[in-house]
C-alpha cells in the first residue's frame, strides 16, 4: 500500500513539473490553436447581425473621434505625444497599445480588436507618405510577405477603391482577397489623414494552384471579417510622425480554449501593426 501511494505521489509530482515546463505550455498552445483553426464546430458562416451592428456602431464612434481630432493642429495625434515618447520614437522605437473596445458580450460570436501604433520616419514628409500609400500597385514590394497582390480598382482624386490579396501566417497560413474604400484628407500641408474601410473579405482555398477558389462562408476560419484602418500623420522634428489605428472584427474563441488561444489572438493585431509601421518607415527611407 505504501509503495502504491508513493508511486502515485511521484506521478503527481512529475505531472505538476511537466505542467510548469515551457515545453508543456507550448504543446498545449499548439494543440489549442490547431483545434481552434480546424474544428468544424468553430466555423461560423458569417458574423451575426448583432455583431456587425455593434462593430458598425463602434466604428462610428471611432470615426467621430478622429474627425474632431483632425480639425486642429493641437492634439492632431492622440493621445498627444510626451517628450519622452517623442524621444523614443526618434530613436526608432514603436509605441503600440490597445484601445479599449466595447465589451465582448455585445458581440455574439465575435471579437472586436482596436489597436493603435505610432512611429517616426526621419526626413519624411506628408507628401512622401501620401505618395507611398496611394501607390497601391507597389504594396507587394513594400509590404511583403503580407501583401501578395494589390491594385487600384477606381480612383477619383483622394478617394479610391483598392483590391489586395493578403496573407496571414500564424501557425497556419490564411490567404484572403480584400477590397477597401480609401479616402485621404489634409488639415494643411503638414497634417494629413486617411480612412480605409473594408468592403469585402473572402478567404481563398488552395491559393496559387489550379484548384484555387473562394471558400464558402461556412468553410472560412473567420480570422478576419471586417477591418478598418485609420492613419494620422504630421510633420515635426525633421521628419514625420505616423499613427495608425486598426479596428477589426473576427470570430470569437470557442469555450474551453480561451486560456490557450486568447493570448495568441491579442498578439496578432500588435504584430500586424508593428509590421505595417516598420515596413512603412523602411519604404519612406528608400
Regions found by a protein language model. Name each.
Residues 27-38:
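Bacterial N-terminal signal peptides
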Residues 4-29:
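Bacterial N-terminal signal peptides that target proteins for export
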Residues 46-286:
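Eukaryotic helix-grip
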Residues 39-45:
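Sec/Tat signal peptide C-region and signal peptidase I cleavage site
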Amino acid at each position: 500500500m505504501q509503495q502504491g501511494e508513493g508511486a502515485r505521489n511521484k506521478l503527481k509530482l512529475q505531472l505538476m513539473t511537466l505542467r510548469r515546463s515551457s515545453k508543456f505550455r507550448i504543446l498545449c498552445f499548439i494543440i489549442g490553436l490547431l483545434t481552434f483553426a480546424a474544428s468544424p464546430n468553430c466555423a461560423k458562416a458569417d458574423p451575426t447581425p448583432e455583431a456587425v451592428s455593434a462593430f458598425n456602431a463602434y466604428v462610428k464612434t471611432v470615426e467621430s473621434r478622429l474627425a474632431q481630432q483632425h480639425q486642429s493642429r493641437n492634439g492632431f495625434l492622440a493621445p498627444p505625444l510626451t517628450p519622452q515618447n517623442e524621444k523614443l520614437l526618434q530613436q526608432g522605437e514603436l509605441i503600440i497599445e490597445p484601445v479599449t473596445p466595447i465589451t465582448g458580450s455585445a458581440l455574439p460570436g465575435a471579437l472586436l480588436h482596436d489597436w493603435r501604433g505610432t512611429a517616426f520616419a526621419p526626413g519624411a514628409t506628408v507628401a512622401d507618405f501620401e505618395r507611398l500609400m496611394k501607390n497601391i500597385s507597389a504594396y507587394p514590394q513594400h509590404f511583403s510577405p503580407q501583401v501578395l497582390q494589390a491594385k487600384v480598382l477606381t480612383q477619383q482624386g483622394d478617394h479610391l477603391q483598392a483590391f489586395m490579396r493578403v496573407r496571414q501566417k500564424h501557425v497556419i497560413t490564411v490567404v484572403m482577397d480584400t477590397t477597401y474604400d480609401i479616402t485621404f484628407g489634409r488639415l494643411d500641408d503638414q497634417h494629413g489623414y486617411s480612412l480605409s474601410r473594408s468592403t469585402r473579405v473572402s478567404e481563398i482555398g488552395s491559393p496559387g494552384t489550379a484548384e484555387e477558389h473562394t471558400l464558402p462562408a461556412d468553410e472560412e476560419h473567420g480570422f478576419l471579417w471586417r477591418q478598418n484602418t485609420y492613419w494620422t500623420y504630421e510633420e515635426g522634428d525633421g521628419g514625420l510622425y505616423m499613427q495608425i489605428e486598426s479596428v477589426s472584427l473576427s470570430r470569437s474563441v470557442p469555450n474551453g480554449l480561451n486560456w490557450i488561444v486568447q493570448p495568441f489572438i491579442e498578439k496578432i493585431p500588435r504584430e500586424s501593426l508593428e509590421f505595417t509601421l516598420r515596413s512603412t518607415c523602411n519604404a519612406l527611407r528608400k
